[in-house]
Amino acid sequence: MLDAMLSGLSGLVAGFTHLHWSNLVMMCIGGILLYLGIKKDFEPLLLVPIGFGCIMVNIPLADLMEKGGFLRTIYDFGVITELFPLLIFIGIGAMTDFGPVLENPYTFILGAAGQFGIFLTLLLALALGFPYKDAVTIGIIGACDGPTVIYVASQYAQHLLGPVTVAAYSYMSLVPVLQPPIMRMLTTQKEREVVMKTHQKTVSKTTKLLFPIVITIIGGLIAPHGLPLLATIMLGNFMKESGAVARLTKASENEIANIVTLLLAISIGATMSGPVFVKPTTIIILALGLLAICLDTVCGVLFGKVLYFVTGGKINPLIGAAGISAFPMSARVVQREGQKYNKKSYLLMHAMGANAGGQVGSVMAAAVMLSVLKGMGII
């Protein structure tokens, strides 16, 4: 009887005896993510559930990520199938206004230039010895687009899902900190003071309706393996612009997006178990992700300088920094920096065009990369 009681009591301390130091480290990291989300307002909709999921999965013997476990069920249902990131893309499309990029088509080029960091980081990751699939997943952090990162990682490098997702969303929230020093370093005082004329053009409803259809068809033909990414964001935008399915549009950008974001974030946190996450490669991945986003900004601003030269000084190179997918955060950074040097400068609409172009550019970059690698037989 006494032995049975002692055995029963030993079950109460089993969790403590199986606690590994790496679990404690990850619990602390989960706590830091909660702090950043709540106190610092860094992407709270993502970092709060990711942080809590991270804490949960590092409690020993709970078996949350074992077959049939609570977190494993959610993970298999929405992440492995890529359903969650694609549903979020429909919501993003429903919330995105491509009007600014249609008013100023040249800003679409800036959105493309802002993706070069992806490919440069991919090459660097390969040079450091990462396998092809891992290098692609690390490079895609430069898309500065969480759902794209999650989609690629869930397909080709599930073991990196936690690190690359945390890197993507953390650095997205740090865009207002990361971009201004790079913008100032690469531009002159004269360039930063350029006042751009705002031409108020009216984009017809027909154009706005045709845009997502044309992009889906052309993008799908060029890079068919990335079509799910491109088609879902364009579907959301088409529903918004049509005005015929207001209930679906509202549900996509509110209820569906909120529920899926919660489940997706918890699932990502569930991949951050101590023995898997606490490795030297994680630090390298975080460093490469930071480099990718910085290189995006560098390439965008440098291309902005090219346009400044070509147009005889009519384009402010700062708007090139908005060519990433952090929408509309990056456009606001450009507006703030421009007004800091010239109170008469109003760059927001031009920057919003580049930013909207970056939304499409990041998805197209991922789609092209996946299709090229598929054609080479690498993935």
How should each PLM-predicted stretch be described?
Residues 1-18, 24, 181-210, 244-250, ...:
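Intrinsically disordered, low-complexity non-transmembrane regions of multi-pass membrane transporters
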Residues 33, 55-56, 81-102, 237-239, ...:
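Hydrophobic transmembrane alpha-helices of secondary-active transporters
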Residues 38-47, 65-75, 95-110, 245-254, ...:
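Interfacial helix-loop-helix linkers and transmembrane-helix boundary segments
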Residues 80-81, 90-95, 110-120, 124, ...:
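Alpha-helical membrane segments and immediately flanking helix-loop junctions
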Residues 101-122, 273-300, 351, 355:
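Entry/N-cap segments of selected transmembrane alpha helices
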Residues 160-177, 288-295, 319-322:
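Alpha-helical transmembrane segments
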Residues 170-244:
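Membrane-embedded hairpin module used as a gating/binding unit in multi-pass transport
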